[in-house]
């Protein structure tokens, strides 16, 4: 189906991971190989949905990461269960891969992002060895909701570096974003009582590192880019 991932192997041959519908009507990820990039032959099915993770699968990716192998894809029509939400998700199967037998062994499954419009991930390998991911910030179902007179509508995420720790994928903004940082503002040892305003933090774009000490509270909220009528809130 949509967006197979093709890459060139070290020996000059080509591999592709694709997705399809299996006999039970749910998704499957298949591996194909080619000597010239034109004539392809089927190798194996890497993973099957078995009606556990949505129905149709899209946008597959298959790559090594920190000693593990990752199969990342976007399931459609998922039901909310555990960390997964309804509709479109992006999930990663983390495990091992035997290149001799082309056998992928799944060890863990995780959601890549909790945003309901996060979709269609793709990764690339940077020259320095970093695995970098991009994705949509808006799905097709929202394309008719653009404001009147809007010249463009939709964007992709800031690229993220991927790493594996304790069997899960961790994501951080690419280090190149450090080059666009402006003035730095520090607040330390702040005791928060009710609503507290920190001076010097303003604007629509900010890179924040916030450390919160445990205390006698059940939740706290950060309000960003706030004016009299609007704000963005993050609640933990």
What residues fall within each predicted segment?
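Surface loop/turn signatures of beta-propeller and other carbohydrate-active proteins
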Residues: 1-8, 18, 40-61, 78, ...
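Residue-level preference for beta-strand/loop junctions
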Residues: 25-26, 54, 204
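Hydrophobic core segments of beta-strands in well-ordered, beta-rich domains
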Residues: 1-24, 29-32, 42-45, 50, ...
